[in-house]
Amino acid sequence: RDVAPSRGLGDVYKEEGIVTDKPENDSIKNNNIVAVRFVEHDIKANDTTCFNVVLPGFENYPNYYTYPDVFRYVDNGTSVAGVFTEGSMYAKYGTTDVPPGWLLALKYVTNYAHVRMIVPSKMGHQSANQYVNPYFYDIRKFQKALN
């Protein structure tokens, strides 16, 4: 049993490295170019369907992971959007639309964030929406591109 005196939550957050305030200059804002490294997993089919990180068994296929996906983030105050400019999501699904589920996280994370999320079909890419498939994303890094 822990008999140490109780500490305030602020102490725990500082020790655990949890960021409670998002620095303004570390936020992803309107018109930022964002590079992303991720793994997409089709929950229904239990299959990894798209990725741009090194995965076991794919070390000898650098075309899959050499470059990140890149998109422009647009926030007009009432809605947000993302437009892929390059990468594997555009190549696989043939659309420049960033899955809306990805964009929801950007208001709450900082540069270099690692996010794991389940995106329901209605918040996913066109294929997810059409076939009513939820996807799990392990987004290893959201990173503002250097201007």
Task: Name each model-derived stretch.
Residues 19-32:
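Short, solvent-exposed beta-strand/turn "edge" segments of beta-rich domains on protein surfaces
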Residues 8-10, 23-25, 40, 101, ...:
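Glycine-centered flexibility sites
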